[in-house]
Curated annotation (Swiss-Prot):
Gene: YMF19
Subcellular location: Mitochondrion membrane
Transmembrane segments: 7-27
Membrane topology: Single-pass membrane protein
Pfam families cross-referenced by the UniProt entry: YMF19, YMF19_C
Reactions performed catalytically: ATP + H2O + 4 H(+)(in) = ADP + phosphate + 5 H(+)(out)
Keyword Transmembrane helix: yes
EC number: 7.1.2.2
Subunit structure: F-type ATPases have 2 components, CF(1) - the catalytic core - and CF(0) - the membrane proton channel. CF(1) has five subunits: alpha(3), beta(3), gamma(1), delta(1), epsilon(1). CF(0) has three main subunits: a, b and c.
InterPro entries: YMF19 (IPR009455), YMF19-like (IPR044975), YMF19-like_N (IPR003319)
Identification of the protein by name: ATP synthase protein YMF19
Length: 158
C-alpha cells in the first residue's frame, strides 16, 4: 500500500471505511456473530450466578470433609515421593557399599517420613474445625504443619 499523500488519501480512507463498516455490520448483525456470542455469554453468566447460589452448601461438615480429603491426598502424595526417594537412596547406598564408597553420606536420608506423616496428621486433626465453627486458617496451618528434612545421623522426629 503506498504512503498516504494528498492525492490518494481520500480514496484509501473511503475504501477502508467502506470495507470496515461492511464487515462490521455483517459480523454484528449475524445471530451467531460477535454480538450473538456476547449475548450468549451474558445469559450464561447470569444463569451460573443464580445456580451458584443454590449449589454452594453452607454445611460445615461438607467443608470439613473437603479439607480432610485434600490434606490426606497431599500427605499421601508426599509420602509416596518420600518413599521413592528413600528407595533410591538405599539403592545408591548399596552400590556405594559394594564399591566401598559412600556416595550419599552427606545427601541425607528420609528415615523420618513416617514420623512426619504422623505429625502432619496429628496437626491436621488438632486444627480441624471444632463444634464452635472455627475454621482452619492460614495462620494455623503455617504454625502447625511444617516440612522437615532429616539430616543423616539424626534421630526420629518428636
Amino acid at each position: 500500500m503506498p504512503q498516504l499523500d494528498k492525492f490518494t488519501y481520500f480514496s484509501q480512507f473511503f475504501w477502508l471505511c467502506l470495507f470496515f463498516f461492511t464487515f462490521y455490520i455483517f459480523i454484528c448483525n449475524d445471530g451467531d456473530g460477535v454480538l450473538g456470542i456476547s449475548r450468549i455469554l451474558k445469559l450464561r453468566n447470569q444463569l451460573l450466578s443464580h445456580r451458584g447460589k443454590t449449589i454452594r452448601s453452607k454445611d460445615p461438615n461438607s467443608l470439613e470433609d473437603l479439607l480432610r480429603k485434600g490434606f490426606s491426598t497431599g500427605v499421601s502424595y508426599m509420602y509416596a515421593s518420600l518413599f521413592e526417594v528413600s528407595q533410591w537412596c538405599k539403592a545408591v547406598d548399596l552400590l556405594g557399599k559394594r564399591r566401598k564408597i559412600t556416595l550419599i553420606s552427606c545427601f541425607g536420608e528420609i528415615s523420618g517420613s513416617r514420623g512426619m506423616e504422623r505429625n502432619i496428621l496429628y496437626n491436621i486433626s488438632k486444627s480441624s474445625p471444632s463444634n464452635t465453627g472455627r475454621w482452619i486458617t492460614c495462620r494455623n496451618c503455617r504454625n502447625d504443619i511444617m516440612l522437615i528434612h532429616v539430616v543423616h545421623g539424626q534421630g526420629s522426629i518428636k
